[in-house]
């Protein structure tokens, strides 16, 4: 039977572990809130860019580029971004739930593909038999331009090569 001292040590150890876990959760929540804030700040810029690009390309018929082609959407590629770990509240669950709902509403069969960014999503999709075209794991909180460019070039390549239409 364990002595009183052993039991007290076990209780203290459990409390310390609990404090560490709570601190990690608070840090993750803070990072998530910062990312959400940055996303909201980016939206007006993105909308203005779309407006400017639409004006430029709408007035010029001489500009030809595969990304500007209008074509029927037969096959869709989704870029799903989750975290690498589970310490971010309901973020991963919400992203996956929204993705699954979208796929169920829009697609009757496997006319879509997934580029999974983050361990959590990549593992979920692999375990559940989804069509994962590509996955990127262990992306840092603030990825470098080179890392983002690599992913972007691959995704744009799928569209240009007409593997996916949207």
Model-derived regions: residue spans:
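Conserved loop-to-helix interface motifs that mediate assembly, gating, or partner/ligand docking
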Residues: 2-166
